[in-house]
UniProtKB/Swiss-Prot annotation:
GO annotations of cellular component type: M band
Disruption phenotype: Morpholino knockdown of the protein results in severe contractile dysfunction of the heart, leading to pericaridal edema and blood congestion. Heart development and gross cardiac morphology appear to be normal. Cardiomyocytes show some ultrastructural abnormalities including narrowing of the M-band and a poorly defined A-band/M-band transition.
UniProt subcellular location: Cytoplasm, Myofibril, Sarcomere, M line
PROSITE patterns referenced in this protein's UniProt entry, alphabetically: LRR (PS51450)
Source organism per UniProt: Danio rerio (Zebrafish)
Main location: cytoplasm
Function: Component of the sarcomeric M-band which plays a role in myocyte response to biomechanical stress. May regulate expression of other M-band proteins via an SRF-dependent pathway. Important for normal contractile function in heart.
The protein's name in its UniProt record: Leucine-rich repeat-containing protein 39
LRR repeat windows: 64-87, 88-110, 111-133, 134-156, 158-180, 181-203, 204-226, 228-249, 250-274, 275-295
């Protein structure tokens, strides 16, 4: 009887063990099926969400002058969805005031992109993938929070226009930007630059430069290397003097230097016949110089131009030369009188 009891007990234990294992297996299979179902539902939901987002983005696409443009303004898009890659034929992004915080790394998929305009957002970083956009002609990132420009931007060989105004902490550019052989328009105003970066001086096609409202203390001595520059905006800086070589900028026709700390105007600038407009307003110039009265019939705008334009500059240089000569003569006379009295 004892042997039979033991045998029955063993069978019951084995049976219970198998029942437990079978139940666990069934539970595991059930959980796995539930997980698969959830993933399938998630994928289906994600697919539908992508379709909805894609449909919404397609509504923002317009065609102007044969160019495909994605235009979004005053909506909330802190990030751009990966589904956007399906619209890689877009040639221009115009995304303004949408709260965008970053440029997606999949930007490199948009090989047809000609204009990337993300002005007035909250972008903090330019991804290195930007360098793969070899057809890009315009990059507009003014009024953002960019503090660093990647060297890869120098690979955008067709870039003609770059705007980085009002990015708060931006104070330097990578030397590789001098590789932008076609760049003609550059706006770096309202930042933290203390001088014009070397890479900017070395841009061979640069025609228009705005570095107003920075903290420029000096201008580079080789500024004349910007041979094609015709417009230079430098108002609201900390400039105390101008290098003589500025007079060698033969293409320069507009020069704005208002609200700096200039004490003098280089005499050599008198020979800059190419200058059409120059502004020295609100500088603590050494000599108080006023142009002779103009005819009463001259309009106020013309008077304003005359007073603070090229005519003022030339008149100031002439007066400074005259007064400097008079001062030298006075000093010389005093010295001669002293020598005479001693004798």
């Amino acid at each position: 009887m004892t042997g039979v009891t033991v045998c029955c007990g063993t069978v019951n234990s084995i049976k219970a063990l198998w029942e437990t294992r079978i139940k666990k297996t069934k539970d595991d299979l059930k959980k796995e099926k539930e997980q698969k179902d959830r993933r399938a539902v998630g994928r289906l939901t994600g697919a539908w969400e992508d379709r909805i987002i894609l449909a919404k983005l397609k509504e923002k696409i317009v065609t102007e002058e044969g160019r495909v443009i994605l235009r979004i303004e005053k909506e909330e898009w802190k990030t751009l969805p990966p589904a956007l890659v399906q619209l890689s034929q877009i040639q221009e992004w115009q995304l303004h005031r949408i709260g965008l915080q970053r440029i997606p790394r999949f930007i490199s998929s948009f090989q047809s992109l000609i204009v990337l305009d993300l002005s007035r957002n909250s972008v903090t970083e330019i991804p290195k993938e930007i360098g793969k956009l070899t057809r890009l002609r315009e990059l507009l990132l003014s009024y953002n929070r960019v503090s660093y420009v990647p060297e890869e931007l120098g690979c955008c060989e067709n870039l003609e226009k770059l705007e980085l105004a009002m990015n708060r902490d931006l104070d330097e550019l990578p030397t590789q930007l001098s590789n932008l052989k076609k760049l003609s328009h550059l706006d770096l105003s309202m930042n933290q630059f203390t001088t014009i970066p070397d890479c900017v001086v070395n841009l061979p096609s640069l025609e228009w430069l705005d570095m107003g409202s920075n903290i420029l203390e000096t201008l580079p001595d080789n500024i004349h290397r910007m041979e094609k520059l015709h417009t230079l905006w430098l108002p609201r800086n900390e400039l105390e003097y101008l290098p003589d070589n500025i007079s060698r900028m033969k293409s320069l026709d507009t020069l704005v230097l208002s609200k700096n700390k200039l004490r003098d105007i280089p005499p050599l600038m008198e020979g800059m016949s190419n200058l059409r407009f120059v502004n020295f307003r609100d500088n603590p110039l050494t000599y108080d110089v006023t142009l002779p009265d103009l005819n009463e019939d001259v309009e106020e705008e013309e008077n304003d131009r005359e007073m603070f334009g090229r005519e003022f500059m030339n008149f100031y240089i002439q007066e400074a030369r005259k007064r400097g000569s008079q001062n030298f003569t006075s000093v010389l006379n005093v010295m001669l009188e002293g020598v005479s009295e001693t004798a």
